[in-house]
Amino acid sequence: ALRLGHEMGKIVSFDINYRNLMWKDDKDSCAKAVMEILPYVDILKISEEEVDMVGGEENIDLLMKEQKLTAVILTIGADGARVFFDGKSFDIAGRKVKAVDATGAGDAFWGGFLSSLLLQGATHTTDITVPMIQKAMEYGNISGALCVQKKGAISSLPTREEIEQIIRREAV
């Protein structure tokens, strides 16, 4: 599916989402599988715990060049995220909220980020700009922050309206 989407010119995103149990504590096998997938990926999401699987944060620019990645998003939990795009990197701070349950926060962030790119009209990697990435990062950040304020993985996922209500309120 990744290869086909990539060949069709679609934006292909990938979240490593490493789980020890799933890989029987074999992080090396997971890293090998990730490296086999990367030629078909445009936007990669990795966490602090996963960054060593792709050579470490200090080598992300090289990884992007070798694998022709459009963007890499490194999530750093409650502290926010760092984006690598177009030869630059920048951070977005995490939102200070009262967390009830962190289950699904990364998925909420990633879903918010990707949906924002689509809502902004990005259908191909060439459509993506720094302002679009910045807006998508904020959208994802709000989504993740809303998620952790409720219990449950699925039931805590915010709606588009909830996210956009915060954006409108903060724009005033």
Q: Model segments located where?
A:
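Conserved phosphate-binding/catalytic region of the ribokinase-like
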Residues: 3-7, 56-172
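Conserved beta-alpha-beta core of the PfkB/ribokinase-like small-molecule kinase fold
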Residues: 1-62, 79-80
